Amino acid sequence: MSNELGSTKILVCPADAVRKTNEAITFDSSPAGLITLKNKAVSYFVNVDANETNGNMVLIGDRNLLIAGQSPTSTGLTLPGTNLLQWNHDIHKLRGNVARADGSVFSQIPSIQIWTNHNNPVRLAIP
């Protein structure tokens, strides 16, 4: 991951006060490293099923999700069918940011539909 990202700073949203206090400095296992801090140093969920063949799929987004009006209770979430993602008050006051697999970005939106990949469930990794 360090070869692709270049810096750990892009893993934390500047508006995410909780994660900002745990911001990783390096990708290693030092006390301030991402390996040590793990999810405490990441502000964004990742759609592990997104790929470049379906550019409309949501790839990443702000972690403070609401799904069917509820916050996820685990770090791994499987969503069948089409789902509406929304956000709670924690970071951007009921709004969120997402990037799709095609590189497009949606900023400060109140909700977005997330679709399955050819009728397969969507799996989200949520810090």
What are these regions (language model features)?
Residues 1-127:
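Short, well-structured segments within or immediately adjacent to enzyme catalytic domains
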